[in-house]
């Protein structure tokens, strides 16, 4: 699959559907309320993310593809917050604002990576006339390569048949992630992407792959579809088209943390690839890879071109080994989204010895990922003298990359890694030796971000200087 690319230079996509604002409150739970038998959450931070059709648009924007988003919001603070989130990602928002309805908002309260409660703020848009949306659609659809109708059953797509006709008249493919059991309303769509539960709720229970194919082809004929992509969780995906063999794709997921927004990712990548002129098979392959990435994240999230490219070429989603600073920032961001604890240390590591190995193993045990920042040759020379380093940077990094305890390696050219640590902001900063925590470069930055700093002991008698001395003594 190496010929596949995660770059989509010719794609432009239009999204129309139920837009939402997802809010997350994070905090610690250490006691039960005296007022009722419920935990008390001391909220320490909060996040806002785009949900529903807005998350679809975010997924497309994360692939560096121009995207326009149509939808209904309230004329309120939540609507302004959602618009702000989207515009930061260069998404063109073209909303119809209603004073009669609030922006759909879902507030989730989490503690220790567990969701305790969800609060929904919404009123259905079923009684809202679609004239303004249809006018916007007629104008915008002429300039894109694909249209996504994102249906969450909130009423934005009340006039979905009219929307499908507008797109088909413009010869633009229409992709729909369906909601409910009334698939008749999606008649004439180019591609539907139901999950297995949604498919069986309409077609009936399937006992085998043959059942899925038979009932899926009947669904295509019944509703005048061009194709059907059924997402099947741990069994991957199945693409069905009339007069063509079924195209089965096994799952790409390694670990599943959260399926929130996975359907959004699938349809986003599908539409983007089709708008770029890819075949349906290639579009499905890329969507399947992207779904395997996004279920490894916490909450609604998007997949970047770097992640998709890595996964296509068999590299891990988070990446391992030697990285640039920007690659490391991205890997750390993804790991934190999965709730992983990031540990960071640094050093010259000129001649690797058992003391180094033991130290790095102990540091790795303190978290889920270990970053090792390594001084460049110029930096080592300034710190240790003109005769150092013995091994150049490439050699030192290559040896460290072979250790199972080390996840990520990055080089820095300054005398200390303070600036780098301030950019990465690990959860735990570790240093070996007899330092006081406040003396460690980067400690202030880590503490200011709510992280911790720890000092680990080195093994007695193990040092690079001792190794060099022994070698020189042998020569003498």
Curated annotation (Swiss-Prot):
Gene3D superfamilies: 3.40.1190.20, HUPs (3.40.50.620). Pathway: Nucleotide-sugar biosynthesis; ADP-L-glycero-beta-D-manno-heptose biosynthesis; ADP-L-glycero-beta-D-manno-heptose from D-glycero-beta-D-manno-heptose 7-phosphate: step 1/4; Nucleotide-sugar biosynthesis; ADP-L-glycero-beta-D-manno-heptose biosynthesis; ADP-L-glycero-beta-D-manno-heptose from D-glycero-beta-D-manno-heptose 7-phosphate: step 3/4. Residues 344-476 are annotated as: Cytidylyltransferase. Keywords: ATP-binding, Carbohydrate metabolism, Kinase, Multifunctional enzyme, Nucleotide-binding, Nucleotidyltransferase, Transferase. The active site is at 264. CDD domains: RfaE_like. One of its GO terms (cellular component) is cytosol. It is an enzyme of class 2 (transferase). InterPro entries: Bifunc_HldE, Cyt_trans-like, PfkB_dom, RfaE_dom_I, RfaE_dom_II, Ribokinase-like, Rossmann-like_a/b/a_fold. Its EC number is 2.7.1.167, 2.7.7.70. It comes from the Bacteria. GO terms for molecular function: ATP binding; heptose 7-phosphate kinase activity; heptose-1-phosphate adenylyltransferase activity; phosphotransferase activity, alcohol group as acceptor. It catalyses: D-glycero-beta-D-manno-heptose 7-phosphate + ATP = D-glycero-beta-D-manno-heptose 1,7-bisphosphate + ADP + H(+); D-glycero-beta-D-manno-heptose 1-phosphate + ATP + H(+) = ADP-D-glycero-beta-D-manno-heptose + diphosphate. It holds the Pfam family PfkB. GO terms for biological process: ADP-L-glycero-beta-D-manno-heptose biosynthetic process. Residues 1-319 are annotated as: Ribokinase. ATP binds at residues 195-198. Homodimer. NCBIfam families: cyt_tran_rel, PRK11316.1, rfaE_dom_I, rfaE_dom_II. In the N-terminal section; belongs to the carbohydrate kinase PfkB family. In the C-terminal section; belongs to the cytidylyltransferase family. Catalyzes the ADP transfer from ATP to D-glycero-beta-D-manno-heptose 1-phosphate, yielding ADP-D-glycero-beta-D-manno-heptose. This is Bifunctional protein HldE. The lineage of its organism: Bacteria, Pseudomonadati, Pseudomonadota, Gammaproteobacteria, Pasteurellales.
